[in-house]
């Protein structure tokens, strides 16, 4: 039976939500009611699959905490008042912490003046952010296109590469096995996870995948494409594969790929949506090898965990294909004043507080602790790896990974798996995590592994 629209129901629901937004605290009955509502509405109106996913990694087999507010820069508080150290970081968006006061203040100040742009007049913050990114990014990167997410940033990069290379007769893209570049149609064509790809086949033609970190395979693919007339427009890579399981390539790999791109006349697109903005101990992961891409993709942490924003930054030579018609690729909300205010404040915080260097220092401390645990629990842990504050613990099988996430939840530390590698639990906290909190995370991981070993022995 078709359901008739109900303005009265929608009005009541929106009014109830606005009342919740105004509240700072909930009493016990309000908390219980909100939990019930959220679970019901996820099941009936969002996607019940999300409930089952959270159930698999949450203490007691429950649906998990209903988040309520940030506890501090590095913690989350649920509706029951439980505080969690955030070692997931919203999949990499909270590099400067939760509700960083500098970022929040910038957004509030802009909101008091003008929240969105007119689309016709020139908006100053978009210009200032583009100038700032031109100064911040490596090499000859100069012009920025702004959007709202990582997958949009990748879509723009692919279209930009096509527009530049099509007159040169180059239409092929090379990506890598294990890659994750997003789930919109173009980005998904570069993504390498069959689970995400198969339901939407056929994807865009002209994409090939080679093993990540294997420079000989990259050379072979470029040569074969040249022989068959399928000349390569661009190679698209993550400097470190995040959703693939925090996979680091061999030293010198990015440098070698850059040389091959130059040799074959292919553009180099670096997807730093997850590795950028100080995450790996440098402002951008490509700086570890002083590699300069032709196109750089950013998002996630660019908005400081306050506003969604993505950016595609390119050299003048490449970006100039859009000069004659700047409307070839645009978005309504891309580069809006609130998002640009958040991004400018985020960059300011990262530089003023030298957070990339802090990420290197605290990341080394955490990784040393996790590697020690891997030595103590070889029956459970296969490897701990990472760079800066992008780390992973890989377990001997998927089930142990889920159990670890559940045990860490009991210890009030929030972690989760990676999308392309179910055996791997990602550790991706805010770069503002304190030394004391780092120690608590390692202690919680030790307790979690000890409890898991007891469970295995008793089984």
UniProtKB/Swiss-Prot annotation:
EC class (word): transferase
Organismal lineage: Bacteria, Pseudomonadati, Pseudomonadota, Gammaproteobacteria, Enterobacterales
InterPro entries, alphabetized: Aminotrans_3, Aminotrans_3_PPA_site, Class-III_PLP-dep_AT, Putrescine_aminotransferase, PyrdxlP-dep_Trfase, PyrdxlP-dep_Trfase_major, PyrdxlP-dep_Trfase_small
Family stated for the protein in its record: Belongs to the class-III pyridoxal-phosphate-dependent aminotransferase family. Putrescine aminotransferase subfamily.
Keyword Nucleotidyltransferase: no
Positions carrying N6-(pyridoxal phosphate)lysine: 300
One GO biological process term: L-lysine catabolic process
SUPFAM superfamilies cross-referenced by the UniProt entry: PLP-dependent transferases
Sequence positions that bind pyridoxal 5'-phosphate: 150-151, 274, 332
Matches recorded under PROSITE patterns: AA_TRANSFER_CLASS_3
Species whose genome carries this gene: Escherichia coli O6:H1 (strain CFT073 / ATCC 700928 / UPEC)
Pathway membership, UniProt: Amine and polyamine degradation; putrescine degradation; 4-aminobutanal from putrescine (transaminase route): step 1/1
Protein name as it appears in the record: Putrescine aminotransferase
Keywords: Aminotransferase, Pyridoxal phosphate, Transferase
Catalytic activity entry: an alkane-alpha,omega-diamine + 2-oxoglutarate = an omega-aminoaldehyde + L-glutamate; putrescine + 2-oxoglutarate = 1-pyrroline + L-glutamate + H2O; cadaverine + 2-oxoglutarate = 5-aminopentanal + L-glutamate
MF annotations from Gene Ontology: diamine transaminase activity; identical protein binding; putrescine--2-oxoglutarate transaminase activity; pyridoxal phosphate binding
Cofactor: pyridoxal 5'-phosphate
Function recorded in the entry: Catalyzes the aminotransferase reaction from putrescine to 2-oxoglutarate, leading to glutamate and 4-aminobutanal, which spontaneously cyclizes to form 1-pyrroline. This is the first step in one of two pathways for putrescine degradation, where putrescine is converted into 4-aminobutanoate (gamma-aminobutyrate or GABA) via 4-aminobutanal. Also functions as a cadaverine transaminase in a a L-lysine degradation pathway to succinate that proceeds via cadaverine, glutarate and L-2-hydroxyglutarate.
A Pfam entry, by short name: Aminotran_3
Record flagged with keyword Transport: no
EC number per UniProt: 2.6.1.82, 2.6.1.29
